[in-house]
Amino acid sequence: DLLNFHESEHPLAIQLGGSDPVALQEASVIAEERDFDEINLNVGCPSPRVQSGSFGAVLMKQPELVRDCLELLIKTVKIPVTVKCRIGVDEMDEDKDLDKFVQIVKDSGCKTFIIHARKAWLKGLSPKDNREIPPLNYERVYRLKDSFPDLEVIINGGIETTHDALEHLKRVDGVMVGRSAYANPYPLVNVDKKFTDEVIGYQL
């Protein structure tokens, strides 16, 4: 069963991909029944296969649809619903258009935005290239937090050390670590002590 997980993995989020509000609603009910702690909507993946299914980063061009999907999810489940996106796609303006996207989407009731601090190019770059070639723009994510202080803004993209994470936390509410966590998980052994002064044991 692909949705099985060990009790020790809590808190655990599940990421959903899609643009059909009803289908997403049905998936969210299953996720809550299976005891996930959070539902995250994928509005950041640029792969051609994902685009062909009308979800992922291409949805940044349809903020009203993203809003409607999230609104239905939030009304359906009791667990938190969040969204993960880029700072823009293709020729979108990183300043004006990102603010517009967040302004529309937050009307769904979604309070947490996880922002990959790169643009996504929907044509001409592979998913791997989209994680590396578009330049990181952390300052843009910081400005987004300044513009929307009532929202929880979590930064993502190219963050490799706990020192980096602590620096980002001076400007945003949270940090998401991706590739570096699975490529080299061992530095995370001491992360609880660095951030909370607690020592928690894990078995790898």
What are these regions (language model features)?
Residues D37-S47, S108-K119, M176-A181:
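Non-cysteine beta-strand/loop elements that form the S-adenosyl-L-methionine
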Residues G17, G44, S54-M60, F113:
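Core AdoMet radical
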